[in-house]
Amino acid sequence: YIDLYIRDEIPGYEEKSARFRYLFGRLRTTAEDIVDRMAEELAESDFKPVAFELGFGGRDGTLPAITIQEGDATLSVSGKVDRVDGWLHDGKLYLRVVDYKTGRKSFDLSDVRYGLGIQMLLYLFTLEKEGQSCFGYPIVPAGVLYHPARDLILKTERDISPEALRKAMDRELRRDGMVLGDPEVLRAMEHSALEAPCFLPIQVSKDGGISGGVATAAQLGRLGQYVEKLLHQITRQLRQGNIDADPCWRGPQESACTYCDFASACHFQDGQAGDRLRPLKRVKADEFWEFVAHETGEEGRHGEF
């Protein structure tokens, strides 16, 4: 396919500069590696792609936009999902949302706690509500995954063994995210998930305990409520005209101001004229779920898979 692309889309390829041909060749190798890894993952899974570039809202959206109403204000969120994988089981379609990332984007519960990094969750929970009209089955949210789509560069010893190199590559390319912790679902996602997971963001102890990026069905249900609550809060703030300069801050290298396109117009100065940094604290998983339970009025209740 790449040879056909070169023939049809890049006339005079052989006359291009050596730098162009080198960079294109490197990009080609990276793309082929990504496709190979994706094929390897799907070969070990009962989850199969059911949609690509699935749109929410807009003129070409397959599903409606995510809409929140607050008084006379309406918030409409549209976008696209890179890929949706599904597993049909007992008359229900388990769906996971997959997003390709060329950088080192990670799924961080601390971000979600403060209303950041919730895009994939928005799509997942919208699929839960609206997906039956598209796919024909009741939808069960099964998780969100960031799929590495980048050139892999490792720092290793020169004489590293092929086996050790493979393990290092697997660690680097493991998916990041959150998945439904039901053992049957995990095994459907990756056949060896309960023994030696290679792709999923989970760890399995010697006694079979599962940890890492997992959540119960009850936790995902509460998380969906919390995300919707966040959207209502955002809508109210927009309706009230809130334009406070209070950027998120975790440190000098992790500030919303670092790469802000509007810095020259904002002139933010912490502590001056009402400007203030909004420090974000790291939260552990148990702290996060306790907070979500409190915010959704579910404290003291316990759900099963």
How would you describe each model-predicted region?
Residues Y1-F305:
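Structural signature of nuclease core domains in nucleic-acid processing machines
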